[in-house]
Every structure is written in C-alpha cells, then in structure tokens.
Design a protein with these regions (language model features):
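Patatin-like phospholipase
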Residues: 1-45, 53-315
Length: 315
C-alpha cells in the first residue's frame, strides 16, 4: 500500500479533548507510529493533553496499558460497578434508591472528586521526560481566575507545574472545582477543543488533527495558506465522555487504529477498509469473468447476482 503522508517530513499533532473517548487517539497514534510518521510538536486539550504527554514520552506500551485497563475510579472517586450501570442505563429497581442517593451526593458536593485523576497523572506521566523532550509539547487550558485561555509549553514548566496543568486542561465541568497552583481552571475545551492554533503559532506547516468530537468550542482563526491539516476522526459514536469503561476503550482504540490506516493509505470504507487499486469497471469485468458464462450477461449480473451478494453481506 502507498503511504499518503511523507516520512521525510515532521508533523505537528493536535489532540482534541473528549474525556473517555480519548482511547481512540492512542489507536490512531499506533498506526502513525508504525507508518514511521514523526512529530516535531504535539498539542493537546483535556484528555488530548494527557495522551499527548504519553506520546511525547514515546511510550506506546504504557499508553495502551492505560486505556486497556481504564476504569471509572481511576478518574473520579466513584464506585465502578455503579457508574457502569449508570452509563449503560442498567440499574435494577432494587438499587435505584442508592444510586440516586449517590448522584445527589455528587451534586451536593459540587461535582466529582478528582483526587484519583491527580494520582493517575503523577503515576503515568514522566514529567521530567516530557519537560525535557526534543518534541515541543503544548497544553491548552483556561484560567477561570484570570479569565484567560492558556497555551502552555511544557519546556517552560517545572515537573509539578506540568502535572498541575495537565490536570487543569482536563478539568471537565462535572469535576469539583479546586485550586491548582493557587488558581481555578476549566477544561481547555471551553475555548479551544481542537488545539491546532498552538501548533500554527509555533511554526508547524504540516499538521495531523486527531478528532474525537468531544465537548467544547472549536477556536475560530484563519489557517495560513501554507499550512496543511490532515484530519483523522471517527465515523461512529465513541460513547459518553464520562464512560471510562475498559471494553469501550479497547473498541475505540481499534477504531482509531483502522481509521488512521484509512487516511494514511487512502483506503476505502468506514466499518472495514479496503485498498482500492483498480477502477470500478475493471473490478466488475474481473468479477464477471470469475462468475463464468452462466452469469455473463449484465442484466443477470445486476438483477440476480448483485442482490444475492448484497443479501449475503447484509448490505
């Protein structure tokens, strides 16, 4: 298969925010990495910033392990089974009262406690490696205290500041508001959910945007004529932004991997992908020859053979 991107170039990688949908980006990164695509800069909003840190670390094994084994209580102080049932709308009548009580407690406490997420960031992210990487890394967040959007460069931060700003970038509206470094922050998606701007401002001419269609606002700005953006994104719904379920994440990683393959090699399809190496007329003629003289007429082919194939494939 012919690669549609240039291995001789280095690209900027923009990672959209979208909570639990983020597993998709790691699958896409795996395909890009296998294809030999290199990055001079990475930018991330929300979960895109957390994934971006692992990409800058170039630790695919860790990133896959994180998403293969993700569960709700790693991100929020909640009961995993209760959250799974809530996400799947599978709550037995006998447990409805206790579940509603738990939801009421979360509302009363003004959101989910994100102490587990803080711990997760500290355990997963090698802050020293990220801060001193040869790959520029930009974190997008929003300071509620200063009413200001921030595009922060990791090399300008110390290790503690980096972890705080990764958490700040991923501060979803459902999370309980707490100060980080003396200030309040909101998820970067409130101003720029697809952080292409940070890459353009820092001189990237070739950019790959990994979309997951999360919650937030796409920043409006003019992309210069000499900047080219390649987009990789899903054609199916990746699920709820709070559905931190391992099975869903594994499925989303697979989707990300194959969607990236589709873009990388110009493949056709949405649920499956094929390499289109011949024209439609040539493919039809080859099929007619394969079927033999009994199916040789175009009328028989269109009225009988094609409907049978479509039925077998459930098209």
């Amino acid at each position: 298969m012919e690669l549609k991107l240039d291995r001789n170039k280095t690209y900027g990688l923009a990672l959209e925010g979208g909570g639990a949908k983020g597993a998709y980006q790691i699958g896409a990164w795996k395909a890009l990495r296998e294809a030999g695509i290199r990055f001079s800069a990475v930018s991330g909003t929300s979960v895109g910033a957390l994934n971006g840190a692992m990409i800058v670390m170039d630790d695919l094994e860790k990133a896959e392990n994180v998403w293969n084994n993700i569960h709700f209580s790693q991100v929020m102080d909640v009961d995993d089974e209760e959250m799974r049932r809530l996400m799947n709308r599978d709550i037995p009548l006998s447990e409805l009262k206790s579940t509603l009580r738990s939801v009421a407690d979360i509302v009363r406490n003004r959101g989910f406690d994100v102490t587990p997420l803080r711990k997760w960031v500290a355990e997963v992210v090698d802050a020293d490696k990220v801060c001193h990487s040869d790959t520029d890394f930009f974190i997008v967040t929003y300071s509620l205290t200063d009413h200001q959007e921030l595009e922060l460069k990791a090399s300008d931060l110390d290790k503690d500041e980096l972890c705080d700003m990764l958490l700040a970038s991923a501060y979803l509206p459902a999370f309980r508001l707490e100060k980080l470094g003396g200030k309040y922050y909101a998820d970067g998606g409130v101003q720029d959910v697809v952080p292409i701007h940070a890459l353009v401002e820092n001189g990237c001419k070739d950019i790959i945007a990994l979309r997951i269609f999360g919650f937030g606002i796409e920043k409006r700005f003019r992309i210069p004529d000499d900047v080219h953006v390649t987009t990789i994104g899903p054609t199916v719904d990746l699920g709820n932004i709070l559905n931190f379920d391992a099975e869903q994440s594994r499925q989303n990683m697979r989707l990300g991997y194959f969607d990236a393959q589709r873009v990388l090699y110009g493949l056709y399809g949405s649920s499956y992908y094929i390499d289109r190496t011949m024209s439609e007329d040539a493919a039809r003629q080859q099929l007619l020859e394969y079927l033999g003289p009994d199916e040789g007429s175009l009328r028989t082919f269109h009225e009988k053979t094609l409907p049978q194939i479509a039925k077998a494939l459930k098209c």
